[in-house]
A protein has these predicted regions:
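P-loop/Walker-type NTP enzyme "switch/lid" segment
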Residues: 41-144, 285-292
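Walker A/P-loop phosphate-binding motif and the immediately C-terminal alpha-helix
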Residues: 2-42
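Short amphipathic alpha-helical segment that frequently serves as the phosphate-/nucleotide-binding helix
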Residues: 17-22, 185, 189, 303
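Hydrophobic/aromatic beta-strand patches that form the interior of the parallel beta-sheet core
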Residues: 5, 37, 107-109, 173-175, ...
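Short, hinge-like loop/turn segments at secondary-structure boundaries
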Residues: 52-56, 194-195, 224-227, 293-295
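Conserved GTP-binding G-domain of TRAFAC-class P-loop NTPases and closely related GTPase folds
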Residues: 259-260, 275, 280-312
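Short, ordered loop/turn segments at secondary-structure junctions
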Residues: 39-42, 113, 158, 179-180, ...
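Conserved catalytic-core segment of NTP-binding enzymes
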Residues: 29, 134-275
Length: 313
């Protein structure tokens, strides 16, 4: 059965684009036909990730009669030939190694990053906006019918803005991505109550994805020594030496002891299940192409987390 999955969050910088891209690539690597859409209309990024210029942008599709075939770019072969090239440099014996090649298909649809194009959509009159919403629905239908997409993966703009909400309207599954900060949590409560609930009532499924949680850069510790924790009571992370990972870990443990299981409490309050806890892997932030982690580093724990996430969907 085909599915349309959207990554959204209240606050920016929660990892939506990274997770969307890696999920799409991993699904394509597994042999599925995948369409990845940059519907972060206000601040697109996939044109930078994929370094491609489409014949037509998603903006053209939404506001005019641009053809879907001119919007979607087939990037499967460019990944596979890049991969073969890297393999051949690494070892002549392994030329053509197929391990991390994409065996399915991957297309991307890009949003136009030019200010005037973003502005044009933002300030469009009601009729144009109404037509664009119809085209949004049509976009999904075309990808399912003409491209025979098994999965449509959608990256969205954060927050409660016109195009973020409309991007969610085409999704069957909403992945509400958040970090473990009060701002993210309070924000998620707001969008859940004001927006997601309405989509859930209309039949979409929603899940919480906690991203960049402790457990890798900062090891996760269970509270084994209460006395040790009481010694650091009253301190803040900012007062601690920056490289003192052990004390940050203790502070996190203490924080947990104060409010034992708030990720689950949020989930219970909202009636939205948690689908994933993805640790913060600071090493992937140093990669120049973090959106390709699952392709380049198939044994990285981040790749396993993305596998788990897509298996759970
Ligand atoms: N699990 C993770 N571990 C470490 N770094 C991560 C993880 N997930 C995402 N990041 C990093 O966090 C940063 C923000 O990610 P990303 O751009 O995907 O967020 P976003 O939600 O799309 O942001 P925006 O709302 O601005 O579009 C990037 O540098 C990315 O590499
Ligand atoms: Mg993004």
């Amino acid at each position: 059965m085909n599915k349309c999955i959207a990554f959204h969050s209240y606050k920016g910088g929660t990892g939506k684009s990274t997770l969307a891209c890696n999920s799409a690539i991993l699904l394509a690597r597994k042999g599925y036909r995948v369409c990845l859409l940059d519907l972060d209309i206000y601040a697109p990024s996939f044109h930078l990730y994929f370094s491609k210029e489409p014949r037509k942008w998603i903006n053209d599709f939404l506001t005019s009669s641009a053809n879907i075939q001119d919007v979607m770019i087939d990037v499967t072969d460019s990944f596979n030939s890049q991969q073969r090239h890297t393999d051949s440099i690494k070892s002549n014996d392994h030329v053509g190694e197929k391990e991390v090649e994409i065996s399915g298909k991957l297309w991307v649809g890009l949003s136009n990053p030019q200010k005037k194009e973003i502005f044009k959509l933002e300030t469009a009159d009601t009729n144009t906006k109404r037509q664009a919403i119809r085209r949004f629905i049509h976009l999904r239908e075309l990808l399912m019918s003409d491209f025979k997409a098994d999965y449509i993966i959608v990256d969205t703009s954060p927050g409660i803005r016109f195009w973020s909400i409309n991007s969610l309207a085409i999704a069957d599954i909403l992945l509400l991505t958040l970090k473990m900060s009060d701002l993210d949590i309070d924000g998620t409560r707001i969008v859940a109550e004001e927006i997601y609930r309405c989509f859930i009532e209309l039949g979409s499924k929603a899940y919480l994805v906690y991203n960049m949680v402790e457990g890798y850069c900062v090891p996760r510790q269970t509270i084994s020594n209460k006395e040790e924790i009481s010694n650091i009571s009253g301190s803040t992370i900012a007062q601690k030496p920056r490289n003192d990972i052990a004390s940050v870990t203790q502070l996190l443990s203490q924080q947990r002891s104060d409010d034992d299981d708030w990720p689950s409490s949020l989930s219970t309050d909202l009636g939205i299940e948690i689908i994933s806890f993805i640790p913060c892997y600071c090493d992937i932030q140093f990669l120049r192409k973090e959106f390709l982690t699952v392709l380049k580093y198939k044994d990285h724990p981040f790749t396993f987390q993305i596998e788990k996430l897509i298996d759970a969907l």
